[in-house]
């Protein structure tokens, strides 16, 4: 099995090394950002050149975002040797609920799926110090299942693993996870103001049975969530059919 690994914590991150170890015996390729890129979401670098450095055999660093890394991996490094699966992680912390909108880990896997390769994003929902081995082994086992039973269209599975041994898992829906909506103002030594967003990192997880948040944080099970690449809000789409925009014709004839 040929595997492309990436992440958003950087090419030298311990979680990435653990993931590579979990695929021992497979043909493993790594293309990852050359530095920390957490919360970079699906940003892609279109207005500057990128550099690609081979730091070890089959192990590459890109001076860009997680999306850049997977794009380069699939369209350059492995252009003539398509991988069977893209796996992103192991992230240093959870990617639950609303986190997936900001996560570079999830975005790297999403880019793989958008480019036609089944993908898995895996995160360890535990504070440091991190032991990534169990999460990496679970992700590898799941990735092998994805390859063995390929879906009709490329799939993205978002995985969150609690600390310690994985005693079980659940296929879970996204929950709702929000942070303190604060902007912290400070002053630099030259008297100029600067800001941190997000406050002190206070997190609220809504209690939603069957959600990834409940599965991981309350029940201590691994959560596997299939993420849909079509962001259309279908209920609102139907509602909009009854709307009109004054002064404009709806669906005019060509």
From Swiss-Prot:
<feature type="binding site">
    <location>
        <position position="91"/>
    </location>
    <ligand>
        <name>a divalent metal cation</name>
    </ligand>
</feature>
<dbReference type="GO" id="GO:0008253">
    <property type="term" value="F:5'-nucleotidase activity"/>
</dbReference>
<comment type="similarity">
    <text>Belongs to the SurE nucleotidase family.</text>
</comment>
<keyword id="KW-0378">Hydrolase</keyword>
<dbReference type="GO" id="GO:0000166">
    <property type="term" value="F:nucleotide binding"/>
</dbReference>
<dbReference type="GO" id="GO:0005737">
    <property type="term" value="C:cytoplasm"/>
</dbReference>
<dbReference type="InterPro" id="IPR002828">
    <property type="entry name" value="SurE-like_Pase/nucleotidase"/>
</dbReference>
<protein>
    <recommendedName>
        <fullName>5'-nucleotidase SurE</fullName>
        <ecNumber>3.1.3.5</ecNumber>
    </recommendedName>
</protein>
<dbReference type="InterPro" id="IPR030048">
    <property type="entry name" value="SurE"/>
</dbReference>
<dbReference type="InterPro" id="IPR036523">
    <property type="entry name" value="SurE-like_sf"/>
</dbReference>
<dbReference type="GO" id="GO:0004309">
    <property type="term" value="F:exopolyphosphatase activity"/>
</dbReference>
<dbReference type="GO" id="GO:0046872">
    <property type="term" value="F:metal ion binding"/>
</dbReference>
<comment type="function">
    <text>Nucleotidase that shows phosphatase activity on nucleoside 5'-monophosphates.</text>
</comment>
<feature type="binding site">
    <location>
        <position position="8"/>
    </location>
    <ligand>
        <name>a divalent metal cation</name>
    </ligand>
</feature>
<dbReference type="Pfam" id="PF01975">
    <property type="entry name" value="SurE"/>
</dbReference>
<keyword id="KW-0547">Nucleotide-binding</keyword>
<keyword id="KW-0963">Cytoplasm</keyword>
<dbReference type="GO" id="GO:0008254">
    <property type="term" value="F:3'-nucleotidase activity"/>
</dbReference>
<keyword id="KW-0479">Metal-binding</keyword>
<feature type="binding site">
    <location>
        <position position="9"/>
    </location>
    <ligand>
        <name>a divalent metal cation</name>
    </ligand>
</feature>
<feature type="binding site">
    <location>
        <position position="38"/>
    </location>
    <ligand>
        <name>a divalent metal cation</name>
    </ligand>
</feature>
């Amino acid at each position: 099995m040929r595997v492309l690994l990436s992440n958003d914590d950087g090419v030298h991150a311990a979680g990435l090394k653990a993931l590579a170890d979990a695929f021992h015996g497979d043909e493993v390729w790594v293309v990852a950002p050359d530095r920390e890129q957490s919360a970079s979401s699906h940003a892609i670098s279109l207005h500057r050149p990128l550099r690609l450095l081979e730091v070890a055999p089959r192990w590459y660093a890109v001076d860009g975002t997680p999306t850049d890394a997977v794009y380069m991996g699939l369209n350059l490094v492995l252009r003539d040797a398509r991988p069977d699966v893209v796996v992103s992680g192991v992230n240093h912390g959870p990617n639950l609920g609303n986190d997936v909108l900001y996560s570079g880990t999830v975005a790297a896997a999403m880019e793989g799926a958008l480019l036609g390769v089944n993908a898995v994003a895996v995160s360890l929902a535990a504070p440091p110090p991190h032991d990534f081995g169990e999460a990496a082994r679970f992700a590898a086992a799941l990735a092998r299942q994805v390859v063995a039973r390929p879906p009709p269209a490329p799939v993205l599975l978002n995985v969150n693993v609690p600390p310690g041994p994985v005693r079980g898992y659940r296929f879970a829906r996204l929950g709702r996870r929000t942070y303190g909506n604060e902007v912290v103002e400070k002053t630099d030594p030259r008297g100029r103001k600067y800001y941190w967003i997000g406050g002190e990192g206070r997190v609220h997880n809504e209690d939603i049975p069957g959600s990834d948040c409940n599965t991981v944080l309350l029940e201590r099970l691994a959560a596997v969530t299939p993420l849909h690449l079509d962001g259309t809000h279908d209920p609102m789409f139907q509602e909009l059919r009854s709307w009109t925009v004054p002064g404009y014709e709806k669906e005019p004839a060509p």
